[in-house]
Amino acid sequence: MISTGLVGLDKLLGGGIAAGIVTDIFGPSGIGKTQLAMQICVNAINEKIIYQDTSGSFRPERILEMLQAKKLGPELLDNIIISRVRNISEQIDNLKKISEMRPGLVVIDTVTDLFSFEYSKESNALEKHIKFMQYMHSLCLLCIQNKIPVVVTNVVRGDEEGYHENLEKSISIFTHKKIRLSKEGNKFLAQVLPCFGAKKEIAYKITPQGLDEIT
């Protein structure tokens, strides 16, 4: 298990980020999705990590701040293999790298962006969902067969029915656990889905050192 760095969230996840599981972190912009993904990387930093960045949001200086907060050396940043992915073909091709390397952690930030960009027309909606589901199926198989913990981040989109995770129906088939990040007033909240029974969530704040739980 890899810790998220948030004790309460780890408990809701059953111990943390598990091997052979695809964990989906989703929420609106500025909510801390990338920060949480980086924090998970820092907690797995002794392993080889593949970090695929589809939006140009990866900032090595943020990882360094988190390492320094844990009194860890900057040389550990070398354990993170960063891929700047610019189109769907590159994103799909990067599956081969995962298969060959079998890293201790894979992070894909953000998993749906390029599919939404390249298939932006309404007439391409079906093709977009099919292509994305094929990709997620391959990623999920790699994750399960090689017992690799995989973390993906995703955005939300608004329509007349409210806000929903981007490509929600297509991604939900292939993700085993979801972490929904949201904000109520001045409070950031993290909830693990599926949630059976009473709603369970933790509150957190965003700091230079990462996400901190508010107890």
Set out the residue ranges of the language-model regions.
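A conditional alpha-helix N-cap/helix-loop micro-motif detector
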Residues: 2-6, 31-34, 88, 129-132
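Pre-Walker A adenine-sensing motif
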Residues: 4-17
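Acidic active-site catalytic centers that drive phospho-/nucleotidyl reactions
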Residues: 10, 53, 109
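Conserved P-loop
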Residues: 18-97
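Short, glycine/charged-enriched secondary-structure capping and boundary segments
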Residues: 39-40, 64-67, 96, 120-123, ...
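Conserved residues at the C-terminal ends of beta-strands
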Residues: 83, 109, 181
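P-loop NTPase motor core
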Residues: 88, 94-173
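Phosphate-binding/switch region of NTP-binding enzymes
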Residues: 141-215
